[in-house]
Design a protein with these regions (language model features):
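Short amphipathic helix-loop junctions that connect adjacent transmembrane helices
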Residues: 1-17
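Helix-to-loop junctions at the C-terminal end of transmembrane segments
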Residues: 28-41, 126
Length: 163
């Protein structure tokens, strides 16, 4: 919100972005559920979702007017609603029955860790540099994560056991 208000955008418009986020999550989840009835590829969903999240940070590099923030939030929400709900499904598919809970717990622990450390890291990065650097670091981090996930999935695809 500070970045947007520094650009002269009102808090009301900022709040509307979160309303847009919520509405889009519901709509996108309905669409994904419908698509998955006919064709489901969980890994493709994660790949596309992560790419889209990374791209949203690239868009923020150009955000000078409200429409850019709307576009970045829309792209972020598409990625968020595509990738993140899929990860527990993949963990469930790859985990033996007797230890599914353990692996779901590990996934949730790392998710919580990111939510705890992310704002602190972001705040420090903004204080030491700028929002622009933060957006570049976030985009690079997401794209590097995407590349690692893609390489690991492809390297282990032939010997992966689905439960």
């Amino acid at each position: 919100s500070v970045f947007m208000t520094d650009q002269g955008i009102s808090m009301t418009k900022y709040s509307l972005l979160w309303t847009l986020n919520g509405v889009l999550i519901v709509i996108i989840q309905l669409i994904i559920t419908w698509i998955n009835r006919y064709r489901s590829n969980l890994y493709l969903q994660v790949f596309l979702g992560l790419f889209t999240v990374g791209f949203s940070f690239v868009l923020l590099l150009f955000a000078k007017s409200y429409i850019w923030f709307v576009l970045a939030m829309t792209v972020l929400t598409i990625g968020e609603a595509t990738a993140f709900p899929t990860m527990p499904a993949i963990v469930n598919e790859l985990s033996p029955v007797n230890i599914k809970g353990k692996y779901q717990g590990i996934l949730n622990a790392f998710s919580s860790l990111g939510k705890a450390i992310g704002p602190l890291f972001g705040g420090i990065l903004i204080e030491l540099s700028s929002y622009r650097i933060l957006f570049v670091v976030c985009a690079v981090a997401v794209f590097v994560t995407l590349a690692i996930v893609f390489i690991v999935v492809k390297a282990n695809q032939s010997r992966t056991v689905h439960y």
